[in-house]
Every structure is written in structure tokens, then in C-alpha cells.
Amino acid sequence: MPNTQSPYTAFAALLSSNGHPVSPAELHGLLIGRSCAGAGFEADAWLADAAGVLENEPEDNVRAALIGLQEMVKAELTGEDIAIVLLLPSDETPLTERATALGQWCQGFIAGFGLNAGGKDLSTDAKEVLQDLVAISQVQEALEESEDGESDYMEVMEYLRVAPLLLYTELAAPAAPAPKPSLH
């Protein structure tokens, strides 16, 4: 087995070594939540929101990692893919730890979305997605180390890879340009 760190583990080590007691999953959820609410992709605004969660101003290496994370999220949300990659522990991590990180991701998403949604009208589907995220954020301890628990985790994770795209499309995606009238 190769001794390479997962992106989650590497980011967790970076945050911890710089005195930031926050999960990479929560930060990633915060970033995607704020982006889906229409906050845009300005680095300074993202860094300001992240600083609130980090509990102190990020050092240069953490700032660079946060900006890199934002660029990745921007590419995912504005690209052609129909799913996002969640920053979560690897599959080799015990299910309870992965479930906790999944809950933290949802909590971060809800916080980021709430900070930036500013009273926007939401469709019924968008409201259901947010209700699902709130429910998922609270079921962390319900998943057990079993085949059923693993299956439930994978199902929830797959849902979370696509559900935010509905919110992004509804609230934040740039509108397609209106067709220009043709002159005859």
C-alpha cells in the first residue's frame, strides 16, 4: 500500500499545524455553500468567510491552499461535470470518522449558504435540498460500521455530490445571454 496522504489528510495536517481547529470538510462545505448562494469567486471575500471559521487569520500557506480550493470549486461549479468532488476522508478511514466529516461538510455548507443567501426566494426543490442537508448534518452517529452503514454513507455522499448543483444553478450560475434579435 503506497504511503501517500489523501487530499483531506494533507489539508487537515496543514490546518492543524497552523493552529486552525477546523475540519477540511467543514471548510469545503462552507466554500461550496457560499458559492451556491451566489457569493461569487472573489478570493478576498472567501478568505474573510474562512477566517471566521479558522478562528484567526490564515498564514500564507493556508491562504494559498484556500485559494487553490476555491479555484477547484469554481472549476467544478462552472464546468460541464454534473457532480462535485467532496473533500472527505478516504474510504480506508473508519466509517464513524467519515460520517462525522460528512456532517461537518453539511454544517459548513449550511453556514456558507446562510451567510450569503440574503433572503433570496428559493424553489421547493431548493428548500428540500437545504432541509436534506440539515438532516444529514445531524445523523453522524447513526451510521454504524456495517455493510448497510457503508451503503447508506455512499448513498448520502453521492447525493451530496449533485444536490449543491441544483442550488448553484438556481441561485448563482450566470444567466445565459439572451438571444439577439435577428434583423431581416
Curated annotation (Swiss-Prot):
Checking InterPro entries in the record gives: YgfB-like, YgfB-like_sf
A GO CC annotation given for this chain: cytosol
Pfam families given for it?
A: UPF0149
Q: What stretch or stretches form a coiled coil here?
A: none
What domain of life does the UniProt record list for this protein's source?
A: Bacteria
Q: Which HAMAP family match?
A: UPF0149
Member of which family?
Belongs to the UPF0149 family.
Its protein name is UPF0149 protein PputW619_5026
Q: Which organism is it from?
A: Pseudomonas putida (strain W619)
Origin organism lineage: Bacteria, Pseudomonadati, Pseudomonadota, Gammaproteobacteria, Pseudomonadales
